[in-house]
Amino acid sequence: MHSLDERFTWGGVELHFDVEKGNISKVQVFTDSLTPDVIEFFANKLVLAPYKEDTITQAIEVTQKQYPAHHDELKQLQDWLVKAIL
């Protein structure tokens, strides 16, 4: 399991990744954000995808389309995760 956590102005996010053969098999999300459904939606888009930068970017783009009001928060999440998994 690979765990990452960060505190943003809009809430804290902790992600636990189970990675098998380079692919994300499971993601657990812990957040005190007022909109946890946005983070959960994003995390669900990562399951069964490769654990790499492109996956994060694609999942963020899909989530931004579903939740356009949270574009800025999702961009912050993307910037953090891309740096954290490199």
Language-model regions, residue ranges each:
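Structured beta-strand/loop patches that form or line metal/cofactor-binding pockets in enzymes
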Residues: M1-V19
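Active-site- and interface-proximal helix/loop "cap" or "latch" segments in soluble metabolic
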Residues: N23-L86
